């Protein structure tokens, strides 16, 4: 099975089981309380999996995180977002939003896991930050 086929199957299976949850987001010190969320992606690379990607460009050197948020929408609307991930227009759809920030904290009482690049790394609360110019690359 291709990477795209596997990602699509996992996405559909996850949507079938998932229920939106209420979260508090602290974005650079400002709190947005009781937001009903289906999905939140914090990224520095617009590619999700296989050929899926977000259409919001990111500057990898600006010290800011890109955040794509899908509000608590119906399972049918979530399923309809899948094709938009393949043509890069998911964050233009109703019920989604995009923002950039230097740091972000996710707070919730729901029992969920935090997944990063396919690995389960913990449970909320979660704080996301980025260190500007922290990685030095030597070529040659």
Model-derived features: positions:
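Long C-terminal subdomains/extensions of small-metabolite kinases
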Residues: 1-140
């Amino acid at each position: 099975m291709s990477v795209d086929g596997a990602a699509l199957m996992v996405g559909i299976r996850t949507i079938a089981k998932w229920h939106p949850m209420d979260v508090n987001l602290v974005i650079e010190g400002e709190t947005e309380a009781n937001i009903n969320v289906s999905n939140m992606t914090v990224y520095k690379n617009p590619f999700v999996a296989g050929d899926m990607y977000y259409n919001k460009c990111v500057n990898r050197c600006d010290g800011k995180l890109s955040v794509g948020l899908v509000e608590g929408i119906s399972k049918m609307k979530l399923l309809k977002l899948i094709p938009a991930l393949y043509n890069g227009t998911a964050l233009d759809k109703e019920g989604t939003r995009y923002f950039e920030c230097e740091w972000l904290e996710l707070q919730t009482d729901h029992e969920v896991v935090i997944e990063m690049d396919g690995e389960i790394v913990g449970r909320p609360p979660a704080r996301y930050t980025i260190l500007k110019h922290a990685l030095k690359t030597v070529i040659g």
